[in-house]
Amino acid sequence: MAKKSIGQLKLQVPAGAATPSPPIGPALGQRGINIMEFCKAFNAATQEMEKGAPIPVIITYYQDKSFTFSLKTPPVSFFLKKEVNLKSGSKEPGKVSVGRISRDKIRSIAEAKMKDLNANDIEAAMRMVEGSARSMGLEVVG
């Protein structure tokens, strides 16, 4: 008999930095998930990734208190800020530009995010990334 899934939990956890402290511990504890077991498994799975990168994780937990999780790629905004060396986006996107990004960099970000984006081809993925860049106050050039 298959395990019965009780629910799912979506979190964004820095790569290699899952700890039982808030906000992770309480979110998992409320659902009866073994916090230390998740932290060890998550940190092991993300040790090859860039330290501190925010990794979206979807945790599926079951009736017998076990769980499985799947990792996604970091958000587009993380890649954009990293490419242009920004701390944060524009306070007034569309009016105040905080930097420029080339189409080549947009393409490389779209290729990295392709498996998580709801796009059929790289051109559609690039348009999604361009939209995110514009909403952060970045100018797309090239």
UniProtKB/Swiss-Prot annotation:
Cited PROSITE patterns: RIBOSOMAL_L11
Post-translational modification: One or more lysine residues are methylated.
Protein's UniProt keywords contain Cell inner membrane: no
Molecular function (Gene Ontology), one example: large ribosomal subunit rRNA binding
Signal peptide start and end residues: none
Cellular component per GO, a single term: cytosolic large ribosomal subunit
Annotated family: Belongs to the universal ribosomal protein uL11 family.
SUBUNIT field: Part of the ribosomal stalk of the 50S ribosomal subunit. Interacts with L10 and the large rRNA to form the base of the stalk. L10 forms an elongated spine to which L12 dimers bind in a sequential fashion forming a multimeric L10(L12)X complex.
Function field: Forms part of the ribosomal stalk which helps the ribosome interact with GTP-bound translation factors.
Protein name, per record: Large ribosomal subunit protein uL11
Organism: Bartonella quintana (strain Toulouse) (Rochalimaea quintana)
